[in-house]
């Protein structure tokens, strides 16, 4: 089981400046030394590198595009197998209603329970309906990761309307709720913690210096 507290997402895609398993492992080490209780990471290679640096549980994903599907976070059993081999403690996967490239969501949950009974499962959702469905399928954690990132939630953001979406998810599911997506300040982190989430994943605001720089530059432009 994940400990309660701050989970830091350490990810960089191939087109990003920090793309490197070595760099991700050092970001994870910095997060650990700063007090993070867990790491979220992408790819078997990154997870294995991170596990040589920190004694923290890892939420593992594999991002891979499939033609004809918008699902790209741990989309099929192929990615699940890679994550099982990585030794991550939690496997996260897209649990939205979007068209899947291969197995159904229920089939993937069954597959993980059969082949890795000691590994927990996290649902990345974008709507309350998806959260409720994931809860019914027996996910251990429900995360708000994809709010605003599906075609039917585009334009929405986790902190709008005083975190109304997060509050509704907390009210509707029995699984442990993880706040993730656009938690970009310590104040927001404190707010979602006070709402009763089990833990919170923060990524770009900590581990993506390009994104952080852009935020500062934009703030200066807005003032001019």
From Swiss-Prot:
Sorted alphabetically, the Gene Ontology BP terms of this entry are: carbohydrate metabolic process; N-acetylmannosamine catabolic process; N-acetylneuraminate catabolic process
Q: Name one GO molecular function term.
A: N-acylglucosamine-6-phosphate 2-epimerase activity
Q: List keywords of the entry alphabetically.
A: Carbohydrate metabolism, Isomerase
- What Gene Ontology cellular component terms go with this record? cytosol
Q: What InterPro entries has UniProt attached to this entry?
A: Aldolase_TIM, NanE, RibuloseP-bd_barrel
By its UniProt entry, which Pfam families does this protein fall under? NanE (PF04131)
Pathway assignment reads: Amino-sugar metabolism; N-acetylneuraminate degradation; D-fructose 6-phosphate from N-acetylneuraminate: step 3/5
Reaction catalysed by this enzyme: an N-acyl-D-glucosamine 6-phosphate = an N-acyl-D-mannosamine 6-phosphate
| Organism domain of life | Bacteria
EC annotation? 5.1.3.9
Query: Per its UniProt entry, what is the enzyme's top EC class, as one word?
Result: isomerase
HAMAP family in alphabetical order: ManNAc6P_epimer
Family to which this protein belongs: Belongs to the NanE family.
According to its UniProt entry, the function of this protein is described as:
Converts N-acetylmannosamine-6-phosphate (ManNAc-6-P) to N-acetylglucosamine-6-phosphate (GlcNAc-6-P).
PANTHER family tied to this protein? N-ACETYLMANNOSAMINE-6-PHOSPHATE 2-EPIMERASE-RELATED (PTHR36204:SF1)
User: NCBIfam families attached here?
Assistant: PRK01130.1 (NF002231)
The identity of this protein, by name, is Putative N-acetylmannosamine-6-phosphate 2-epimerase
Organism of this sequence = Staphylococcus carnosus (strain TM300)
